[in-house]
Amino acid sequence: MIRATSLYAAIDLGSNSFHMLVVREVAGTLQTLARIKRKVRLAAGLYGDNRLSSDAMQRGWQCLRLFAEHLQDIPPTQVRVVATATLRLATNAAEFLGPASAILGCPVQVISGEEEARLIYQGVAHTTGGSDERLVVDIGGGSTELVVGRGAQALELFSLEMGCVTWLERYFNDRSLTRENFERAEQAAREKIRPVAFRLLAQGWQVCVGASGTVQALQEIMVAQGMDEHITLSKLLQLKQRAIHCGKLEELEIEGLTLERALVFPSGLAILLAVFAELGITTMTLAGGALREGMMYGMMALPVGGDIRQRTLENLQRRYQLDTEQAQRVTWLADGFARQVAEAWQLDERCFTLLRCASMIHEIGLSIDIKRAPQHAAYLVRHTDLPGFTPAQQKLIATLLQNQSNHINLTQLNEQNCLAPRIAQRLCRLMRLAIIFASRRRDDALPAVELRAAEETLYVILPQGWLSQHPLRAEYLEQESQWQSYVHWPLLLEETSQV
């Protein structure tokens, strides 16, 4: 039974949506118990004199009554509620905040744009893998946050008064998706960004991550259309052209775009295009968390330490009581194999990292049953929250685990959108071999294996006499050669006198 005192809640009263996150701490990370989101569109109820309409207030209070039921058994000291752009602007915000606090039974804090940006960055730093030198972009309903940081520290942060709801009302209020409306929206956004761009550019970054509903919508569109997870300027321009072709907001149809996100998608897209243009962004991926996660980690005083993905995988190993020594053997072999054929097979550091990640948890399916263990492993990875991994990376790892032995499903390997299909297939081949060679579960039983690749033909070169001295693994390798031949992957076994 989960004690209420072990629960924490973070509530974000945004300009477009209200969100609630309920978690508990497990092994130094967060286990999500509930996520509730309601479209309130508070910013749409802001009049020209910055007064919030009574209808918008009623929508907000109605949503908070739903949230309040979840909070009844959580100590108020373990609840944090913040309000952002719209309630910063509203001249009559106090009229909304008093009843809101009474409904929730705890205070509502209207945070500054800079504090919002800081919390967003903390949420990203705690949940997103990759380089520690990052630019974070969060397009909210009423504001857009831009932050450059290293590790857990935000170095430059800005909150700009533009968001997908306010830009919708200002530049698409006629609901027409014309080129002229897009150009006006983009130009206005660029004028907001330009005064701060030089300070962000001066810091520099290695990766760019997006932490907004607009970026989430783009991810959903790209997955639905079979594209990879990287958001690029060319993809944004294609989507803009598609929106213009649809003509009217009510007629906007893009494969993968949900009805819920469609209303503010064009305005968010216009802002994102401006961000790309002013900051010279080449590629962006989706962040693992943002404002609410930043609030939560701050409340629980959990440090940002080490590699987030490594911490996630080690937590999985503990949770499912995996044999970490065996995981290390397979990981070491798989990584070594990949580096031997890296040039011939065009494998880079990203490939090495993802292969190591899959190898570290390849036996996770055994925690359910040895029968269909690869399928169990894939299911667990697909349906577990993995901080530090993007949805596409998570899908790739699950696919590699599902294809770690016996039958090979080429369709699955080709449909993941993290790596090119051919590269995913090659990683699969290498991990399967690593598992076979490590099957004795002893360090002193690992042979000196040399791999060579010529296009798709893979040569496995072993010391002279090794196959006859190890008949079981020799049989596994012969079977593996057969499995790979079924999908037209030539695997040839050779022995050499050189050890």
Swiss-Prot record:
Record EC number: 3.6.1.40
Pathway assigned in UniProt: Purine metabolism; ppGpp biosynthesis; ppGpp from GTP: step 2/2
GO biological process: guanosine pentaphosphate catabolic process; guanosine tetraphosphate biosynthetic process; nucleobase-containing small molecule interconversion
A single MF term (Gene Ontology): guanosine-5'-triphosphate,3'-diphosphate diphosphatase activity
Enzyme type, top EC level: hydrolase
Keywords on record: Hydrolase
Protein name per its UniProtKB record: Guanosine-5'-triphosphate,3'-diphosphate pyrophosphatase
Gene that encodes the chain: gppA
